[in-house]
């Protein structure tokens, strides 16, 4: 079956939901999708389609990042629903890294919770530039002053992590009540229900406050591989989000990292199940590669314009080590510490060979909550550049976050 063409009419923005588990991130994602589908007369993604991760549903946890698309009058959005559970911070790092802006969901009934703080911190570290706040479950709060108190607390928390807490738009509402209304009447328009209107107000705030990103289209092409699969009779497809540049069918690219660098040609491009002539920075895309076996390519490699990025094992970085309260280590570490470095889409084991305090003074050990400059050496070479962000993880939890300040080897 020939695939329909993806039409590029409006500016495209990647956003996502972040916040504490059970504060209503997935319900809000479904409510936005349904509300805008009703207004634009298109088909929405249902809650259970968004939250679909069968292997983890048994434990009542959302894992996997679900991608939903929807449109406002002004823009086309790709929305990532980030997992809200601390065990899956790893996925949040891949998910949140794909956001031009985020909707922070906070239950008005509970106020900010530990993961609210953790997600704000992560958003800062993975470089999510802008945040809009949705105070959910407003129907459960009778006291207007309580709502104002929660807003104040969240604003202070945002300021603490260097977001402009005083300027960030806040919208209160109920994702569940809005979703129920749209489910009853799937052609409901703005002005017909107060809860549905609050979702429209939220998207007005997102439209206005989260700037259309200046895409890195002019830069050289780079995409980190998230997943790889074979299509019988057609070859191997690598999927991921184009970090920068433009890619066209017929272009030659390099596959860099983890193994010897190899070169291949692009034979096809797809997005949202539709074929494309070219993909550009910000697109979540599937790239069909000529003459590449599924076993030759894996998550964590990057596809790049030939000669523009090289694999490295040693670098210097500015790093923040999480406190115990933020879900980090409880004890200090010393040089020779061997954690995993989570870079773009993969974990690589490495050794922290030396470090100094952030002011350059000598340090014997690193305490939770410290900011340090450090040198690291990885066991496998991966595509690294100056200014690139990464997480430091051990035993499945994030213990630090950093940015590469210099490449050594």
Swiss-Prot record:
Region ranges (G2): 60-64
GO CC aspect terms: chloroplast; cytosol
Tagged with keyword rRNA-binding: no
Claim: Transcription regulation is one of the keywords in the record: no
Enzyme Commission number, as recorded: 3.6.5.3
Alphabetical UniProt keywords: Chloroplast, Elongation factor, GTP-binding, Hydrolase, Magnesium, Metal-binding, Nucleotide-binding, Plastid, Protein biosynthesis
Binding site for GTP: 19-26, 81-85, 136-139
Enzyme class: hydrolase
Residues noted as binding Mg(2+) in the record, renumbered to the chain: 26
Residue intervals of the tr-type G domain: 10-214
Catalytic function, reaction form: GTP + H2O = GDP + phosphate + H(+)
Region (G1): 19-26
Span list, region G5: 174-176
Positions of the UniProt region annotated as G4: 136-139
Subcellular location(s) per record: Plastid, Chloroplast
Main location: plastid
Region (G3): 81-84
Family to which this protein belongs: Belongs to the TRAFAC class translation factor GTPase superfamily. Classic translation factor GTPase family. EF-Tu/EF-1A subfamily.
Function: GTP hydrolase that promotes the GTP-dependent binding of aminoacyl-tRNA to the A-site of ribosomes during protein biosynthesis.
Full protein name: Elongation factor Tu, chloroplastic
UniProt organism field: Gracilaria tenuistipitata var. liui (Red alga)
Lineage, highest ranks first: Eukaryota, Rhodophyta, Florideophyceae, Rhodymeniophycidae, Gracilariales
């Amino acid at each position: 079956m020939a695939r329909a063409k993806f039409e590029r009419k409006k500016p495209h923005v990647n956003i996502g939901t972040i916040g504490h588990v059970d504060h209503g991130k997935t319900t809000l994602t479904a409510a936005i999708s349904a509300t805008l589908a009703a207004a634009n007369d298109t088909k929405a993604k249902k809650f259970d389609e968004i939250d679909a991760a069968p292997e983890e549903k048994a434990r009542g946890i959302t894992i996997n990042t679900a991608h939903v698309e929807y449109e406002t009058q002004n823009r086309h959005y790709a929305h990532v629903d980030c997992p809200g559970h601390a065990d899956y911070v790893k996925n949040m790092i891949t998910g949140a890294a794909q956001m031009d802006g985020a909707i922070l969901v906070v239950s008005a009934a509970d106020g900010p919770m530990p993961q609210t703080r953790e997600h704000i911190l992560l958003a800062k570290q993975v470089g999510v530039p802008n945040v809009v706040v949705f105070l959910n479950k407003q129907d459960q709060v009778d006291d207007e002053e309580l709502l104002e108190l929660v807003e104040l607390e969240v604003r202070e928390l945002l300021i603490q992590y260097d977001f402009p807490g005083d300027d960030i738009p806040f919208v209160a509402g109920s994702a569940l009540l809005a979703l129920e209304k749209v489910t009853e009447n799937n052609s409901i328009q703005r002005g017909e229900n107060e809860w549905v209107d609050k979702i429209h107000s939220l998207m007005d705030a997102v439209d206005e406050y989260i700037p259309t990103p200046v895409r890195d289209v002019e830069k050289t092409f780079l995409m980190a591989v998230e997943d790889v699969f074979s299509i019988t009779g057609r070859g191997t497809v690598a999927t991921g989000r184009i970090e920068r540049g433009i890619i066209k069918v017929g272009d030659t690219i390099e596959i860099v990292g983890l193994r010897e660098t190899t070169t291949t040609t692009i034979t096809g491009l797809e997005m949202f199940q539709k074929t494309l002539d070219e993909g550009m920075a910000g697109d979540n895309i599937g790239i069909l590669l000529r003459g590449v076996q599924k076993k030759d390519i894996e998550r964590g490699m990057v596809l790049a314009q030939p000669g523009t990025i090289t694999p490295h094992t040693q670098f210097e970085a500015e790093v923040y080590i999480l406190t115990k309260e933020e879900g980090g280590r409880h004890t200090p570490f010393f040089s020779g510490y061997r954690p995993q470095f989570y870079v773009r889409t993969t974990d690589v084991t490495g050794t922290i060979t030396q470090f100094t305090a952030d002011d350059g003074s000598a340090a014997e050990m690193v305490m939770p909550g410290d900011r340090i400059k450090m040198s690291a050496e990885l066991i496998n070479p991966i595509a690294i550049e100056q200014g690139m962000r990464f997480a430091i993880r051990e035993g499945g939890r994030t213990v630090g976050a950093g940015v590469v300040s210099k490449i050594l080897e």
